[in-house]
């Protein structure tokens, strides 16, 4: 059961974490589903019934497919962005309590999508589509200033806290999020670029 009136009547800020989760979930589905989803963002934001029902159905179907995947690597697809989320939260320390949960998760997804471009050839156009979709939902980039060395150390710490392997669930294509090894050089390069871009927002 899903009471759509609760969605329509909710404070827009309260819905943003759900929007971010939708983006990550549909990204794990398929190219055609992703295209359908991104095209209906305005209708979802407007609270149109068909768009909301479709979004919920697409999300539930995608989540079911991940959980029932025969490939063990694919079962981690719903964790896309969460290592970056936990890393940013830990590095921000007490300041993280002032940052909405949806922004922490969206930043994790933005960063890991860029890692995926180098680590598993995720098309750069799709990286930008993830950015655009989050922006369309009103979720802007977060401004902060962190030291790259501390971020890298925490990122690896968060990885190994849940696995003995240095692998991340990253999209190789729309609908194909798999565990992928990320070399130190790739991580370092992207961390430096990512943190520099966020510092410029201050």
PLM segments and residue spans:
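Carboxylate- and glycine-rich phosphate/diphosphate-binding segment that chelates Mg2+/Mn2+
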Residues: 2-80
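Active-site segments that bind and position negatively charged phosphate/pyrophosphate groups
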Residues: 48-149
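Surface-exposed loop/turn and secondary-structure junction residues enriched for glycine/proline
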Residues: 4, 9, 20, 47, ...
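Short helix-capping/linker segments at secondary-structure and domain boundaries
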Residues: 25-35, 92-97, 115-125, 163, ...
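C-terminal charged capping/lid subdomain of soluble metabolic enzymes
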Residues: 39, 124-202
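Structural motif
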Residues: 10-16, 98-101, 161
């Amino acid at each position: 059961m899903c009471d759509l009136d609760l969605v329509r009547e909710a404070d827009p800020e309260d819905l943003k974490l759900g929007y971010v989760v939708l983006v990550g979930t549909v990204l794990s589905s398929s190219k055609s589903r992703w295209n359908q989803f991104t095209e209906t963002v305005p209708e979802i934001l407007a609270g149109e019934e068909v768009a909301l029902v479709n979004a919920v159905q697409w999300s539930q179907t995608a989540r079911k497919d991940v959980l029932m995947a025969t490939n063990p690597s694919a079962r981690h697809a719903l964790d896309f962005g969460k290592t970056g989320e936990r890393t940013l939260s830990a590095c921000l320390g007490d300041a993280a309590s002032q940052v909405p949960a949806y922004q922490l998760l969206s930043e994790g997804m933005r960063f890991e999508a860029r890692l995926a471009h180098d680590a598993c050839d995720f098309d750069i156009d799709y990286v930008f589509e993830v950015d655009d979709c989050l922006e369309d939902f009103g979720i802007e980039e977060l401004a902060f200033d962190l030291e790259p060395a501390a971020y890298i150390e925490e990122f690896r710490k968060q990885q190994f806290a849940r696995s003995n392997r240095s692998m991340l669930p990253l999209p190789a294509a729309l609908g194909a999020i798999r565990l992928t090894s990320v070399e130190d050089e790739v991580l370092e390069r992207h961390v430096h670029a990512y943190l520099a871009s966020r510092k410029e927002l201050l």
